[in-house]
Amino acid sequence: MTKPDLASLEKTIEKAFDQRDGINTATRGEVREAVEQSLILLDRGEVRVAEKQADGNWHVNQWLKKAVLLSFRLNPMEVIKGGPGQSSWWDKVPSKFDGWTANEFEKAGFRAVPNCIVRHSAYIAPNAILMPSFVNLGAYVDKGAMIDTWATVGSCAQIGKNVHLSGGVGIGGVLEPMQAGPTIIEDNCFIGARSEVVEGCIVREGSVLGMGVFIGKSTKIVDRATGEVFYGEVPPYSVVVAGTMPGKNVPGENWGPSLYCAVIVKRADEKTRSKTSINELLRD
């Protein structure tokens, strides 16, 4: 689509969102068409909820998040076929693969292992691999990414090129509050098994998270080499493991419970990453 078309879509979505209390399953016309077109563009990867700028910052297209939210008001619950044992689901969001044949899969160019679930409006780039996993609406999974077994990519999350989300990883979705940005895993990151990155946090390019690392907006991310503490963002090429920090003493005592933190144990640039296995990087 041309820029004027996108500008028109954005204007319609913004106006509709301001008047969302009057929008329901009976709504027809311009609003419904704009929402449906926005979701199709997201599904094709022609637009995305967040885009990285030349300065490294991420610009969030809030109007696309609003389009996703409006779709819940517009669409009724309905039977969705394809459940185990010829059963069905009951939901408002169809599968990305609804009506697909071999032709669509070949054109898309990614691998979808049985029992992976991808909702309509999520984009999956060529050469990505989806093990039995869940990718929520509005998400963007870039080229060569591996979404391993039982991993979850939340709504509007951005997964970069060649990212590996190990088994059971959770990447949080962010639709509301509206001003919040999506959770972002930049290119060439490795996220260890059962780790969680949520609340719109960003893991910068080339970083490695060990198994069981949990990062939210309030999590202290401590650089062991410098003592610097980060919140909400893992710096580029960081190697991060789970750790603890001393807590405040309990009243009347000289001890207190330790508190969870994430620890940057080293920095591994692109050259080091290419020559070193993940297990070696995570050894202290």
From Swiss-Prot:
Q: Which UniProt keywords apply?
A: Acyltransferase, Amino-acid biosynthesis, Cytoplasm, Diaminopimelate biosynthesis, Lysine biosynthesis, Repeat, Transferase
Reaction(s) catalysed by this chain, per the record, are: (S)-2,3,4,5-tetrahydrodipicolinate + succinyl-CoA + H2O = (S)-2-succinylamino-6-oxoheptanedioate + CoA
Offer an example of a GO molecular function term for this protein: 2,3,4,5-tetrahydropyridine-2,6-dicarboxylate N-succinyltransferase activity
Query: Which residues does the annotation say bind substrate?
Result: R111, D148
The main location class comes to cytoplasm
Asked if tRNA-binding is a keyword of the record, the answer is no
What GO cellular component entries does it have? cytoplasm
Enzyme nomenclature, EC number: 2.3.1.117
Q: Which GO terms describe its biological process?
A: diaminopimelate biosynthetic process; lysine biosynthetic process via diaminopimelate
Q: Where in the cell is it found?
A: Cytoplasm
| Pathway info | Amino-acid biosynthesis; L-lysine biosynthesis via DAP pathway; LL-2,6-diaminopimelate from (S)-tetrahydrodipicolinate (succinylase route): step 1/3
Q: Which HAMAP family match?
A: DapD (MF_00811)
Q: How does it assemble?
A: Homotrimer.
Entry similarity comment: Belongs to the transferase hexapeptide repeat family.
Report the protein name in the record. 2,3,4,5-tetrahydropyridine-2,6-dicarboxylate N-succinyltransferase
The source organism is Brucella suis (strain ATCC 23445 / NCTC 10510)
Upper lineage is: Bacteria, Pseudomonadati, Pseudomonadota, Alphaproteobacteria, Hyphomicrobiales
